[in-house]
Structures are given as C-alpha cells and as structure tokens.
C-alpha cells in the first residue's frame, strides 16, 4: 500500500507540475509518465485516465484531510473547502474548466449533491420536486466556485463565503416577499 501511494503521489505531482505550463486538454498520460519516469502500465494500474488522477488528488488532499482531522459542518465546512481551493487555485482553476465525462466538475458534483440533497429534503420534506431544487442549487454552487476560483485574483475565501451566505439570504427574503 505504501508503494502504491508513493506511485500515485509521484503521478499526481507530475500532473500538477505539467498543469502549471500546459492546458489540461493537451496533457497526455504519456506526458505525465515521462515527467515522473514511470511507464503507462503503472499509470493505468492505479488510474482509469488523467481525470481519475485529478479526482484522486482532491480526494486525498482534501477529503481524507477533512475525514481525519476536522469534523466540520455547515458554513465552517464551506469555508474550509474554499480555503483549500484558494491555496490550490492554480491547479483547480484549470481542473474546473474541464467538462468531460469523468471531469473534476462531475466528481465535485457527485460529492456536493448528496450533502445538498440532505439539507434540501430536511427543509422541503419529501416533495416530488426536491430533485429539481438539489440540481438547481448544485449547479449554482459549482458555477459559483468555478467562477470564483477562475478569476485572476479571486477574492479571499472568507469574503466569498460571506457572499454565498448573502445570496441564500436574498433567495429567502425574495421568497418571503413573494408569499406576503
């Protein structure tokens, strides 16, 4: 297992280094392997494709860190995630632009959607339209994250989270006005 993690980490480092100068779409598995002196067979033993490697980077660097160290909920978890993206903005700025079948955006959606679904179903109950709301808010959050991190100089994470909170408050206030 230790050798496996060393190999995966070497491939991840190679991809990150390549992404500093090369658009993701132009990076091949051969490029990644050449960068860390491995063969393609080693790559494919561990990953399906380069998208799988990007997702593994997020899972190991962020998700495993959260599961091991912090038990964050609510806005604290959003801020923690934003801090991670901000610290790694050069990498995720490029990763979030890719919209292929196995892209990071899709992986991120798979992680965010169940969390949002839980909150939305708690608020709405088991309405038949709950899936619509989950998809709507997932799209909004993922788009907001992508737009934020893609800026040349993204606003600090704390400010971004404050703006997200404000957006939700505006939605709630608008709904209250419409119902009165």
Locate the predicted segments by residue:
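C-terminal peripheral helix-coil segments that are non-catalytic and often amphipathic
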Residues: 147-180
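N-terminal positioning helix adjacent to the helix-turn-helix/winged-helix DNA-binding module
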Residues: 3-10, 129
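Secondary-structure edge/capping motif, primarily at the C-terminal ends of alpha-helices
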Residues: 69, 92-95, 120, 148, ...
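Amphipathic alpha-helical packing segments from all-alpha helical-bundle domains
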Residues: 80, 100-124, 128-143, 169, ...
């Amino acid at each position: 297992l230790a050798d496996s993690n060393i190999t995966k980490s070497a491939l991840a480092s190679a991809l990150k280094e390549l992404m500093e100068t090369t658009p993701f779409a132009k990076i091949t598995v051969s490029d990644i392997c050449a960068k860390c002196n491995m063969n393609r067979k080693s790559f494919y033993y561990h990953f399906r494709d380069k998208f799988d490697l990007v997702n593994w980077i997020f899972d190991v660097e962020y998700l495993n860190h959260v599961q091991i160290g912090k038990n964050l909920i609510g806005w604290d978890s959003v801020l923690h995630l934003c801090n991670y993206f901000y610290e790694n903005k050069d990498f995720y700025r490029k990763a979030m632009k890719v919209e292929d079948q196995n892209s990071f955006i899709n992986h991120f959606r798979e992680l965010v959607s169940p969390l949002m679904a839980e909150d939305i179903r708690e608020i709405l109950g088991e309405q038949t339209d709950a899936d619509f709301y989950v998809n709507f808010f997932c799209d909004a959050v993922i788009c907001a994250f992508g737009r934020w991190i893609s800026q040349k100089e993204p606003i600090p994470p704390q400010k971004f989270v404050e703006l997200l909170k404000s957006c939700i408050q505006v939605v709630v206030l608008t709904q209250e006005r419409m119902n009165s």
